[in-house]
Amino acid sequence: MRDKSYSKAIAAAIVTQVFWGLSFLASSIGQETVSPFVLMSYRFNIALIALTVPVLLGRQKLRLRGKSIKPLLLLGSMEPCLYFIGEQYGLRYSNSAFSGIMIAVIPIVTIIFAAAFLKERPSKKQWLFSALSILGIIVITLAENSGGSITFKGFALLCVAVVTGSAYSVISCGVSGRFSVFERTYFMQIMGAVFFTTLALIENGGSVAAVLAPATNLRFLLAVLFLALGASVAGYSMFNYAVSHAPMANVIVFVNLATVVSVAAGIIVLHERLAPVSLVAMVVVLIGIWGVQKYPPKENLED
């Protein structure tokens, strides 16, 4: 039987991917004004401030005394640090279709990692429906491709994103017994803030004024506030909760929902046109997600 924590975990996974799907639009708006490093610096510093407030008010506690923080360092290194380097710059050195296809592979790689390190083995039907969902994403990205070339550098960077994004999910699940959802999420924002602020300052010749200059741009600020509070604070908190209370295959397949949300946001907000085949592919993605939830391993049904 599946309990309430499982239902909450699946709900959290869905809401997370809505936030992350919309984050592509917010990132595009933010990068009209600044580089990816500066945008990430703002994002994670604001997120860190937001999460520090409840700590200072005594509403949340960090129980790290006597614990090794090496797992948290590894977690934060995978994501946000290395993942966003791979994703942001992988897209820059390849076309959008290839990038979308590479990122769509993350659920399958994550399931493989979970089977190897967490001993979570999905059912054959879950493998099938996961592949179906990925097929839908491939069709969408090819149909919506805006052109561009593919370089080896772009491929290598996207491989970094795939491996680190998959590793993050598995590590978060693996350390859930030692560190709370809040502790994991908080530490990720610390590492993101330090890492990307350092890179932003290096990129701008050490000029703090240059990094702070975009703060007067309202359109930029609204985009970065969504990224910080929605995609980082809410998104990572809910995803860390989800992987702690539901099988990895059931959670990670929702990653493909983010692409559906991203395409829908482009149509609604930016008035982009949707190819008919993309609409069919979006339905295929949703069927794939449904199938993964519908056909868990038999042992999960008996728990």
Protein language model regions, located:
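Glycine-/small-residue-enriched transmembrane alpha-helix faces in small-molecule transporters
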Residues: 1-41, 148-174, 198, 300-303
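Juxtamembrane helix-entry segments on the extracytoplasmic side of multipass membrane proteins
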Residues: 5-9, 33-37, 41, 64-70, ...
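Helix-helix packing/entry segments at the starts of transmembrane helices
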Residues: 17, 40-42, 84, 98-105, ...
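Specific transmembrane alpha-helical segments of multi-pass solute transporters/efflux pumps
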Residues: 19, 23-24, 52-103, 139, ...
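Hydrophobic/aromatic residues within transmembrane alpha-helices
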Residues: 30, 39, 43, 90, ...
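Hydrophobic transmembrane alpha-helices of multi-pass small-molecule transport proteins
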Residues: 51, 113, 122-144, 196, ...
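Transmembrane alpha-helical segments that form core, pore/gating elements
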Residues: 51, 110-112, 149-208, 238, ...
